[in-house]
A protein has these predicted regions:
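C-terminal membrane-cytosol helix-exit motif in multi-pass small-molecule transporters
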Residues: 1-14
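Extracytoplasmic gate region of multi-pass secondary transporters
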Residues: 31-68
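Transmembrane alpha-helical segments of major facilitator superfamily
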Residues: 67-76, 158, 162
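Residue-level signature of mid-helix packing/kink "hotspots" within the transmembrane helices
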Residues: 73-81, 166-167
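Helix-to-loop junctions at the C-terminal end of transmembrane segments
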Residues: 78-91, 177
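Structural signature of the two symmetry-related core transmembrane helices
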Residues: 94-109
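Intracellular juxtamembrane helix-capping segments at the cytosolic ends
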Residues: 132-146
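A late C-terminal transmembrane helix in Major Facilitator Superfamily
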Residues: 149-177
Length: 177
């Protein structure tokens, strides 16, 4: 994946001076960005880390588990452009909240009702398609409130929060399973 970037004749973009930003300041600027990234890290790690375990416990074959997990990535690939397009034209906060509500509803339906495998694959595509772009939406939303020189520092803080949330996703999901 890095080869095209490394071989491109274009120089890396020049950044003006960057400034650090504390977690307290970052949270005061964008509580949605901070809390969203923490939750997104937990949800991503639970989804992608435990989906195959859930599939095995549910009696899916190895091939079905592979298709199920792969469908989440395909959904992210397919829906990232329409969601990005919508993000550039609507209130990002409302888009993040709306997509999160749809994802929660889809997860709830999937958890409560036994689904045929083909429907399960569709659900996985929808969940992957919605949850993967939320990561980028949260960064973009936070950056909307920052001066350019604080964006890199804020991104570092958001990535840290995402990673911190990722620690608890598979563990808490494993306990619930």
């Amino acid at each position: 994946a890095f080869m095209p970037l490394l071989l491109a004749p274009t120089p890396a973009p020049a950044f003006d001076s960057t400034r650090r930003i504390s977690f307290a300041r970052l949270f005061s600027i964008s509580p949605l960005g901070c809390i969203g990234m923490l939750l997104t890290g937990g949800i991503f790690s639970a989804m992608f880390g435990m989906a195959s375990v859930w599939g095995a416990q549910s009696g899916l074959s190895l091939a079905q588990i592979s298709i199920f997990v792969g469908a989440m990535y395909v959904g992210g690939l397919v829906l990232q452009y329409p969601i990005g397009w919508a993000s550039d034209r609507t209130d990002r906060r409302k888009l993040i909240m709306g997509l999160s509500a749809v994802a929660a509803l889809v997860m709830l339906v999937a958890a409560l009702a036994p689904l045929p495998f083909t429907v399960l694959v569709g659900v996985a595509m929808i969940l992957g398609g919605i949850t993967n772009p939320i990561y980028s939406l949260l960064i973009a939303y936070t950056n909307d409130f920052l001066p350019r020189e604080q964006m890199a520092g804020a991104s570092a803080g958001l990535i840290f929060l995402n990673g911190f949330g990722a620690i608890f996703g598979p563990t808490s999901t494993g306990w619930m399973m």
